Each structure stands twice: as C-alpha cells, then as structure tokens.
C-alpha cells in the first residue's frame, strides 16, 4: 500500500493527488486513528491506497518513484508518473501487510480543510501561509478589493511560523 499522511503543510496538494486517484477509479481510505506500522507512524486522517484493489497496478504506477536501472539507458517519457514528486506531496510506500488491517473509511472526494488559529479578540490581521500552494493566487484574486500585503521575511504569530511571501490581510473593524 501507499500512505499519504495527513497534516502536510499544503493539504490542497494532497487534495489534488487524491482527486486524481479517485478520478482514475482508485479506491482510497481515510484512517480513523493514528497508525503505527513498524517504524512508521501516520496521523489520523491519513489516506491509505491499497494495492490489492482493481486499479492497484495503476495506483502503483502513479505513486511509486520511477527508478531507471541503468542511467545510460534512460528512456524518453513525456509523462510524469510519480504524483508525490510532481506535486510536492509526501507519499510513503508501506510494504508491511499490517497496513491492510488498518480501519479506514472510504473517500469519494477529498476536501482540504483550513484552520484559523487564535481567538480573534483584538485581531486585526489574517495571515495565509505561503506554502507554495497555487491557491494563494486564487485567494489573492478573490480578495482583490481588499488590502493584501505579502510578508517580506519569515515571522512568527504566537506559536505559528509563517514564511516570507505569506499573505497578510487587514481585517478592518475587528473586535
């Protein structure tokens, strides 16, 4: 199987990979709790892609890292098949068959969920972390009528570290 761990920095990339797999007919399961298999640990909500399914071979092709056995005989391929590398999404192969016994719920559509940290009391700014997501461009477009700034260097807001390029949106009239 392959596991796509929950809690990655940009879950919209995970959503993209999951949606591509689902569109191909590949079955995904979301873990109900934390998973520990040998030295590997995955948080609750991780996605399990079993290879013992009708489209298991396709899942393997899309998720497995391509290895060329002889660097002098590299074949030309105008397609990229390693979804994790293409999308900067962590995808872990798991050879231990114990992964097949992990309780999961079927996933028909994956939706990335954001979060808001802080209580909002006295908050005058909302920050959107610059984690490389193409969705920041869409966010910036949707907020075109608002004052949106980009952080010129990394900074911390409470316990949260935000990289340079993070969007800062002023919230006027915040309580």
Describe the function of each predicted region:
Residues 1-175:
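Intrinsic-disorder/low-complexity accessory segments
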């Amino acid at each position: 199987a392959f596991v796509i761990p929950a809690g990655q920095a940009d879950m919209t990339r995970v959503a993209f990979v999951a949606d591509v797999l689902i569109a191909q007919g590949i079955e995904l399961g979301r873990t109900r709790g934390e998973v520990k298999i040998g030295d590997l640990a995955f948080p609750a909500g991780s996605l399990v892609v079993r290879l013992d399914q009708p489209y298991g071979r396709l899942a393997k092709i899309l998720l497995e890292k391509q290895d060329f056995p002889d660097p002098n005989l590299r074949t030309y391929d105008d397609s990229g098949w390693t979804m994790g590398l293409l999308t900067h999404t962590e995808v872990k192969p798991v050879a231990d068959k114990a992964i097949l016994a992990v309780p999961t719920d079927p996933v028909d559509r994956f939706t990335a969920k954001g979060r808001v940290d802080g209580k909002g009391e006295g908050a005058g700014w909302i920050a959107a972390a610059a984690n490389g997501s193409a969705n920041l461009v869409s966010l910036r477009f949707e907020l075109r009528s608002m004052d949106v700034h980009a952080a010129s260097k990394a900074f911390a807001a409470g316990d949260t570290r935000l990289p340079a390029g993070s969007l800062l949106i002023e919230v006027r009239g915040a309580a």
